Amino acid sequence: MKDIEDLIQKAVELQSNGLAMGQIADELNVSRETVTWLLTRSKKEEITPAPKDISVNWNNIGKSAKRLHNISLALCDVALENLEKIGAEVDVVVGVAANGIPLASMMAYELGADLAIYHRKGQETVRAGKGTISRNFGSVAGKNCVIVDDVITTGSTSREVIEQLREMGAKPRVVVVLVDKKGVDTIFNVPIQSLLKVVRLD
């Protein structure tokens, strides 16, 4: 997306394809507040101030298996560094649907760990419901878990995953992401490690 008009057009297109607000936010890597602003701005000429947000477009990584693999290796290194500090091993890599899955798949392979997939629920509101761990992949009960996502915007997804894993008897040890837009070090005492931290200066 080169500018704000591209973001508005993409948000309108995604909405017309039936995506919910939360799904549009995930697809564009922006907050729900920003999606609301983009869609509202597309419908009227009234100019309201833009929310303080940053759009992250990583499709040059996502469209290349080689680049995804290289980024996954870097995320593995970050995760292992953190696990060494606490003397823990990784048993399961948990990919957050949808954008965390390709990274988590490659990481699980590289780390010799099981793969689990977390599907969010409640895309329309932040806490509409709990997500689920897919039964078609690895079990998390009693296991050390590395959580993988693409971008942290508000931290709500990471909070949801950590809570759900703990309720299932798992031990979330670290969250690794490409980009942290929130700028947090921990969520529920679980370290957040990113390849990039984005800080907006106003």
Curated annotation (Swiss-Prot):
Bridged cysteine pairs (disulfide): none
Keyword field contains Transcription regulation: yes
Gene Ontology MF term list: DNA binding; orotate phosphoribosyltransferase activity
Top-level taxon of the source organism: Archaea
Any one GO BP annotation for this protein: regulation of gene expression
Keywords in alphabetical order: DNA-binding, Transcription, Transcription regulation
Keyword Transmembrane helix in annotation: no
A family per Pfam: Pribosyltran
Gene3D superfamilies: 3.40.50.2020
Comment on protein domains: Contains an N-terminal DNA-binding winged helix-turn-helix domain and a C-terminal regulatory domain (or effector binding domain) resembling phosphoribosyltransferase (PRT) domain.
Record family assignment: Belongs to the purine/pyrimidine phosphoribosyltransferase family. GfcR subfamily.
Protein name per UniProt: Transcriptional regulator GfcR 2
Taxonomic source organism: Methanosarcina barkeri (strain Fusaro / DSM 804)
Record lineage: Archaea, Methanobacteriati, Methanobacteriota, Stenosarchaea group, Methanomicrobia
Gene name of the record: gfcR2
